[in-house]
């Protein structure tokens, strides 16, 4: 198990920690979350993220018929507290989105931005963090297929989005249920915020016939 480095620099962060939204969502080992499209169970379209015990960690509520009509989306914790607001920046050719700490207020400055690296076709996403460190991340892969790596400028993977396999049956579940695996020391709330943005930018291809759809389950 990889542990978070204990040396504490002047700015108060431990070495290896990447806090963008909330330090409460830093983990000292790989943290897999089961992420579900809430349209499976409720009216509207949003997300719910569960840990391996079945406890809800994050939620994103949307009551419109299509979340891609929304210019502003809120990421909440299990109690409904607003952790992060992501907002589409207009006009932009690169589909830029910005993230704001908590519930966004007029004139508030963003803490990060996400943009397509190209205006043509599927491409990588570029993430820039505005905390004075100059941190940048790349999102590589195809979110519509639930296959993405998020890595830093040193090519170290900090989070991964992948299809979920039912451990008991070895059946790959449908794309409305997938895994977000957060690496040690990376901000899980930030990672979930990036999932929300990816869903807005890339959207979903039509779900293939035969995709399994199930409620999140408790893992052994």
Curated annotation (Swiss-Prot):
GO CC entries: cytosol
Origin superkingdom: Eukaryota
Purpose: Might be related to the phospholipid scramblase and tubby-like superfamily of membrane tethered transcription factors.
UniProt family annotation: Belongs to the LOR family.
Protein's recorded name: Protein LURP-one-related 12
Organism: Arabidopsis thaliana
